UniProtKB/Swiss-Prot annotation:
This is UPF0757 protein YmgG. Pfam families: Gly-zipper_OmpA (PF13436). Belongs to the UPF0757 family. Signal peptide: none annotated. InterPro entries: Gly-zipper_OmpA-like_dom, UPF0757_YmgG.
Length: 114
């Protein structure tokens, strides 16, 4: 019950933050949708945070213009590094896939910010 309350509070804070109301970018919208999906998956705060990170990465990739181009370049590099790290960790193809997803999302967010 406590984890669910914390997760709902986290999503609420994201949804009603000043940045999300002022002019939500695709990255912000993706983070909100991902956080909501993570909450609905029943994994508590961990699911909310993972969902928000992946959603923000997908949102950053779909941005238009220069920010989107930089996000896509960052996602490519991040996915490559993540896949290699996943294989080297000894988890085989499953580790490579997880590493590519997480690395791609992180790389997209960082690429968009730069």
């Amino acid at each position: 019950m406590r984890n669910t309350l914390i997760a709902v509070t986290t999503v609420s804070l994201l949804a009603f933050s000043t940045a999300s109301l002022a002019g939500p970018s695709r990255t912000t919208k993706g983070a909100l949708l991902g956080a909501t999906a993570g909450l609905l998956s029943g994994n508590g705060v961990n699911g909310v945070l993972k969902g928000a990170a992946l959603g923000a990465g997908v949102g950053a990739i779909s941005e238009k213009g220069r920010k989107g181009k930089k996000a896509r370049k960052g996602a490519t590099i991040g996915a490559t590094v993540g896949a290699v790290a996943g294989v080297l960790s000894g988890n085989g193809i499953e580790g490579a896939i997880k590493g590519a997803v997480v690395g791609g999302a992180g790389g997209a967010i960082i690429g968009r910010i730069q």
